[in-house]
Design a protein with these regions (language model features):
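Bacterial N-terminal signal peptides
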Residues: 14-24
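Bacterial N-terminal signal peptides that target proteins for export
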Residues: 2-15
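Predominantly soluble domains enriched in secretory-pathway, periplasmic, or organellar proteins
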Residues: 4-7, 26-455
């Protein structure tokens, strides 16, 4: 029975990827212009029938990434609202009500510019150890927090740049207890942190531009002993064995126009469809969308246009659905993996739909980075001069210089929140494909920000 067409095989591990000389099966760069797409094996068509459960509410200023704990049914959000890192936290949110239960008081660092937070950007949940891992991207460090107390329990902050455990510009992090490692993307390398010893091993993505010396994308995907890493500048997806930490396969991504960069951003897989899905930002709207590849061979199957800067994606294996954010339009695509087509588009705020995660009941949780009109009052605003934390609706920037080298004086800025979207769609089979169903969420009352927790 064919794995790609049988739902009886849902969740079954796919066989090992074939290895070529030197242990890497590579899809050549010329493949992007010359290869003929493999026809999709699934012709199932579905449409959205129930779109009532779509709610949007106020979130944090400066939202970056979102993570979800299935064990506690809590959502975790990392938010940093300003470049000077005077407004930053991680928040724990109830997945049912979307009420913000707690915001952490992050560690404060003093340097020659004054005081700043050890700011949070990337985030992931470790339900085995009851922790949350956070990337402090602009401080070149990674930290771990206790889920219950929200206190920092480990960090790489403060280690020297010459230390082999130093990670430059960490962006995304995922914890894998099967291999005993936490994987981190950053500049130059993908890093693996040993969960017991905290020692760091690094790998450059061979075949990426400049020998893999540029920034790696903000997203990673783990499955069955494989780490899938999209590399934006080279347009490739690297498949890394999590135990050996060696590249086993390289897939050259494709879009609608082979003369324009694809810029892959995120990746996921579907075992029952035997497919890899990759979101890509493209350039000026060209090559923005979802590309589909055969999971076993890496062969290109189809490109589906969506938005103007398709960014993050999340997969629901049980229903063969993929959810894709578009930073350009602020919409979220509901992509049907059985038919390989977009069947729904959920509105947010007109721009900057950013990160997405799937809840255990099949609901989808999305963050944007678009500021709402009204200013908000936060309990964790740091004074960069005194180091004092206050409840405020404004913050003061540090003086600096613009890109032309001109002096920019300090200024007072209003705090404005981003939004959180939650939705779930109902489905039914249909004989023919139809235009995507548009979904507009209703507003959910915001319950306010709680006092800060931990230190």
């Amino acid at each position: 029975m064919n794995l790609a067409s049988s739902k009886a095989f849902k969740g079954l591990a796919v066989g090992s990827l074939a290895l070529a000389i030197s242990g890497v099966a590579t899809i050549p760069a010329s493949f992007a212009a010359e290869s003929t797409p493999v026809a999709s094996q699934s012709t199932d068509a579905r449409t959205i029938t129930d779109k009532a459960m779509a709610k949007i509410t106020q979130g944090l200023p400066g939202q970056f990434q979102v993570a979800y704990s299935k064990k506690t049914n809590k959502i975790w959000v990392a938010g940093t609202a300003d470049r000077d890192k005077h407004v930053s936290t991680i928040a724990r949110i109830d997945a049912n009500s979307l009420k913000i239960e707690a915001v952490a008081e992050l560690p404060i660092v003093k340097n020659d510019k004054g005081y700043q937070y050890d700011a949070a950007y990337g985030i992931t949940v470790d339900d085995v150890d009851g922790t949350v891992w956070v990337t402090n991207t602009t401080d070149n460090s990674v930290s771990v927090y206790d889920q219950a107390t929200m206190q920092q329990v480990w960090t790489t902050a403060g280690i020297a740049e010459t230390d082999p455990n130093w990670i430059e510009h960490p962006r995304s992090v995922l914890v894998d207890h099967e291999s005993g490692k936490a994987f981190v993307t950053g500049r130059f390398f993908v890093s693996a942190i040993d969960l017991k010893t905290k020692q760091v091993e690094k790998i450059q993505l061979e075949g990426a531009p400049d020998g893999g010396t540029r920034y790696i994308s903000m997203n990673l995907f783990l499955d069955g002993g494989k780490l899938y890493v999209p590399e934006r500048t080279g347009g490739k997806v690297f498949v890394i064995n999590t135990k050996t930490f060696k590249t086993e396969q390289v897939i050259q991504t494709r879009g609608e126009n082979s003369s324009v960069e694809v810029r892959p951003s995120d990746v996921t897989i579907d075992h029952s469809e035997n497919e890899i899905y990759v979101s890509s930002q493209g350039v000026d709207g060209v090559n923005s969308g979802i590309s589909v590849y055969d999971l076993t061979t890496g062969a290109f199957k189809k490109f589906v246009k969506f938005g103007t800067q398709a960014l993050a994606l999340e997969h629901d294996e049980d229903r063969d659905l993929v959810y894709v954010t578009d930073f350009g339009t602020g919409k979220v695509a509901v992509f049907d993996g059985r038919a390989d087509e977009v069947i729904g588009e959920v509105e947010m705020n007109g721009a900057a739909a950013n990160d997405v995660t799937l809840l255990k009941d099949g609901s989808v949780l999305v963050l944007d980075k678009k500021d709402c009109d009204e200013k908000v009052t936060l309990p964790y605003v740091l004074n960069g001069t005194t180091g004092e934390i206050t409840t405020a609706s404004e913050y003061t920037t540090l003086p600096g210089k613009d890109r032309q080298g001109n002096d920019v004086p300090a200024s007072v800025q209003q705090l404005k929140a981003n939004s959180i979207l939650k939705f779930k769609v109902g489905l039914k089979d249909t004989d023919v494909s139809a235009a995507p169903v548009g979904i507009t969420p209703t507003s959910l009352d915001f319950a306010g920000y709680p006092p800060v927790t931990g230190v």
